[in-house]
């Protein structure tokens, strides 16, 4: 027990040159046993792993949200969960591949788009499989609930013939989102049931956008 208060040389680990076991345990419990779980030790690239660790452990990198920011996150979580609960109640047994348990994806995507707009990004291309796609369409791409519910009722209407008749959780959409006066065009690419098939398509689309926007700083 006396060893708990002996100084240990850390050489910068947990941002300290030295510390006691008691202090180390307190720090680790406060950082890794709180409301957020982190998983990054599986990353094979040591530079990426250290970057992630520094983002988690350094005080100056700690996430700090304003009250308005917290309200916006809560509002998006409520929208995401409410959407899933409604579909579960209204369309019992219908395939929808819900986002249940992963609703934090919605405010996370919103934040990425918002920060992107602040960084002068004009377009965002998204590729994803069908899990949570309907929620992203409704609450990030702002596809109307009416259109989504019509698709549940079997009324598939699409502007193009290429995707006409496809199931609702394969469809994509696009919209212009505005945050703090910055407009960002966001598009979600259609994807079949082959989960990762969309990945090279989105990479190619993003590369084409870079070419036509003369974006050479990539």
Question: Which stretches of residues belong to each language-model region?
Answer:
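Conserved internal helical-beta-strand scaffold that buttresses enzyme catalytic cores
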Residues: 1-218
């Amino acid at each position: 027990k006396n060893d708990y208060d002996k100084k240990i040389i850390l050489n910068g680990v947990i941002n300290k040159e030295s510390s006691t076991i008691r202090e180390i345990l307190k720090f680790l419990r406060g950082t890794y046993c709180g409301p957020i779980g982190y998983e990054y030790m599986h990353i094979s690239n040591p530079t990426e792993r250290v970057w992630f660790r520094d983002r988690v452990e350094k005080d100056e990198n700690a996430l700090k949200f304003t009250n308005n920011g917290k309200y916006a996150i809560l509002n998006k979580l409520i929208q995401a969960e409410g959407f899933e609960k409604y579909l579960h109640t209204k369309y019992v047994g219908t395939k929808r591949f819900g986002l249940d348990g992963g609703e934090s994806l919605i405010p996370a995507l919103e934040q990425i788009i918002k920060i992107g707009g602040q960084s002068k990004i004009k377009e965002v291309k998204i590729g994803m499989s069908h899990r949570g796609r309907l929620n992203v369409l409704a609450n990030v791409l702002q596809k109307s609930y009416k259109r989504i519910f019509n698709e549940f009722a079997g009324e598939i209407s699409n502007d193009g013939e290429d995707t006409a008749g496809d199931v609702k959780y394969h469809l994509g959409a696009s919209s212009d989102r505005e945050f703090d006066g910055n407009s960002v065009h966001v598009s979600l690419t259609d994807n079949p049931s082959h989960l990762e098939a969309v990945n090279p398509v989105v990479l190619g689309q993003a590369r084409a956008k870079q070419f036509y926007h003369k974006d050479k700083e990539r």
